């Protein structure tokens, strides 16, 4: 069970712990992950994903999962997120979306 965000791919990073005397020791920073259920309004589906808190705040700020994925570059998304994004684009293009008038 890896500690990686399913949407952005954010994972453990490394740095230094610096003491008062300025000694530096290696340390790692873990991602604050949460198991959440995100709803796609266009597809009318729920997706159970492991998401970083930072990503979750960004999704809320952008207006939901659909708008976040459509307005984010595919290079910044994981393969799981790219598949969801493709399904959303196809649903909008074919007119089979649950709420096509909102986007």
UniProtKB/Swiss-Prot annotation:
* Keywords associated with the record: Ribonucleoprotein, Ribosomal protein
Q: Is Ribosomal protein there in the keyword field?
A: yes
InterPro entries membership = Ribosomal_bL28, Ribosomal_bL28/bL31-like_sf, Ribosomal_bL28_bact-type, Ribosomal_bL28_sf
Cellular component terms (Gene Ontology): ribonucleoprotein complex; ribosome
Taxonomy, superkingdom: Bacteria
Kindly list the GO molecular function terms attached to this UniProt entry. Answer: structural constituent of ribosome
GO BP field:
translation
HAMAP family in alphabetical order: Ribosomal_bL28
Q: Which family does it belong to?
A: Belongs to the bacterial ribosomal protein bL28 family.
UniProt-listed NCBIfam families: L28
Q: What is this protein called?
A: Large ribosomal subunit protein bL28
User: What are the top taxonomic ranks of the organism?
Assistant: Bacteria, Pseudomonadati, Pseudomonadota, Alphaproteobacteria, Rickettsiales
């Amino acid at each position: 069970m890896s500690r990686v965000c399913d949407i952005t791919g954010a994972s453990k990073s490394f740095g230094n712990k610096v003491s008062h005397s300025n000694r530096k020791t290696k340390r790692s920073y873990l991602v604050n992950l949460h198991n959440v259920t995100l709803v796609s309004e266009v597809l009318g589906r729920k997706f159970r994903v492991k998401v970083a808190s930072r990503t979750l705040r960004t999704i809320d700020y952008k207006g939901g999962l659909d708008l976040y994925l459509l307005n984010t570059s595919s290079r910044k998304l994981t393969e799981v997120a790219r598949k969801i994004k493709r399904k959303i684009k196809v649903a909008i293009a074919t007119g089979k979306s649950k709420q096509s008038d909102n986007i």
